Amino acid sequence: MALRPWQLSLLLLALLVAPAAPGEAIEGTVVRVVDGDTIHVKLWERVEKVRYIGVNTPETHHPTRGEEPGGREAAEMNRRLVAGQRVRLELDVRARDRHGRLLAYVWVGDLMVNAELVRLGYAQVMTVPPNVKHQELFVKLQREARDAGRGLWRGG
């Protein structure tokens, strides 16, 4: 029996809002880079706001502090890595934050963007349990970036 269009839409919506199993992956296309650690991804016919797990970049539009130093550079690096790209979103224990954003480790091919931003020095480690799957890697990469003076660690 074939599904009617409304039934298929309902099924896809249920899959998007249901709690995800750790390690589950969803594929989509980046349609907007918001800043250094947030993107919009088209998943089927819906666009989801995705926040990178385990990392934090300086803000480009903070509600009280405005643009933070390095925010524009981090956003530009993120744009270079993901804009228009097909991505794989790897989920961890908690799938959404308190703002309703999907939380993910973002992959372009074999490159984990979260880790690459830390490695290049454009993001710092921000661990929010229970999403800690790649925490040790992020801490190691941050130490290396800081020691090498890369990205936001330059000159100070």
Regions found by a protein language model. Name each.
Residues 2-156:
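Small beta-barrel nucleic-acid-binding modules, primarily SNase/OB-fold domains
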